[in-house]
């Protein structure tokens, strides 16, 4: 988790600084600057694919949530998410940033609260340790897992972090933003990990 947090801070700072230097309005100038025209164009396709995949998962997840929590048809949840997404995008880049600024702290706070409740209601530590020892190892290489986690989170974020860096006034703001954002994501990751670690036996 510490490695993930450091990498979030580092790559977030690099991407926003490039966006500030290159005066970008999209991710394309950044990936071309880093990888050249050929690799940059390929990266553009990859980022677009990741964004489309994330959008599809988000819409499907909203449908599943509406069905599970409210016993409504999944299509209603998907249509609701599509409507909110379209309205947000039509509002421009500032509208997207405002929505992220509202949702992201709420998600991190929710993860922390769930983790705290899980810790307070968990069995004694000795029982947890015993159950973990008897449990098969899910990921054997923590470094490789950290790199993969960072990769699929950072790649689609370039399209937001680049233009966001362009709107900042100096490197100090970029540095502070990357630091706070990385720490926040690290706290969220730690909270999720602790919850899954303790409740792994109940996950099916």
Question: Where are each of the predicted segments found?
Answer:
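Hydrophobic, membrane-embedded alpha-helices of multi-pass small-molecule transporters
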Residues: 1, 47-51, 55, 118-123, ...
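Extracellular/periplasmic helix-exit of transmembrane alpha-helices
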Residues: 11-17, 148-149, 183-204
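Transmembrane-helix boundary/entry motifs in multi-pass membrane transporters
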Residues: 20-51, 68-74
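Small-residue-rich segments of transmembrane alpha-helices in multi-pass membrane proteins
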Residues: 33-43, 104-120, 182-193
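Hydrophobic alpha-helical segments and their helix-loop junctions in multi-pass secondary transporters
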Residues: 48, 85, 89, 107-133, ...
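Membrane-interface helix termini and inter-helical loops of multi-pass transporters
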Residues: 61-69, 121-137, 202-204
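Membrane-interface loop-to-helix entry segments
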Residues: 62-63, 75-76, 88-119
């Amino acid at each position: 988790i510490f490695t993930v947090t450091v990498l979030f801070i580092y790559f977030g700072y690099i991407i926003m600084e490039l966006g500030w230097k290159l005066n970008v309005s999209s991710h394309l100038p950044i990936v071309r600057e880093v990888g050249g025209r050929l690799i940059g164009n390929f990266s553009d396709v990859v980022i677009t694919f990741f964004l489309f995949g994330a959008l599809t998962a988000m819409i499907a997840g909203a449908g599943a949530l509406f069905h599970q929590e409210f016993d409504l048809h999944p299509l209603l949840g998907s249509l609701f998410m599509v409507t909110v997404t379209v309205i947000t995008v039509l509002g421009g880049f500032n509208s997207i940033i405002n929505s992220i600024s509202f949702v992201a702290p709420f998600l991190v706070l929710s993860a922390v609260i769930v983790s705290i409740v899980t810790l307070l209601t968990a069995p004694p530590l000795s029982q947890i340790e015993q159950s973990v020892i008897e449990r098969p190892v899910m990921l054997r290489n923590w470094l490789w897992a950290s790199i993969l986690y960072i990769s699929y989170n950072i790649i689609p974020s370039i399209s937001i972090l680049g233009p966001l860096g362009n709107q900042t006034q100096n490197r100090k703001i970029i540095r502070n933003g990357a630091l706070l954002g990385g720490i926040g994501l690290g706290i969220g990751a730690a909270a999720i990990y602790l919850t899954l670690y303790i409740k792994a036996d109940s996950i099916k």
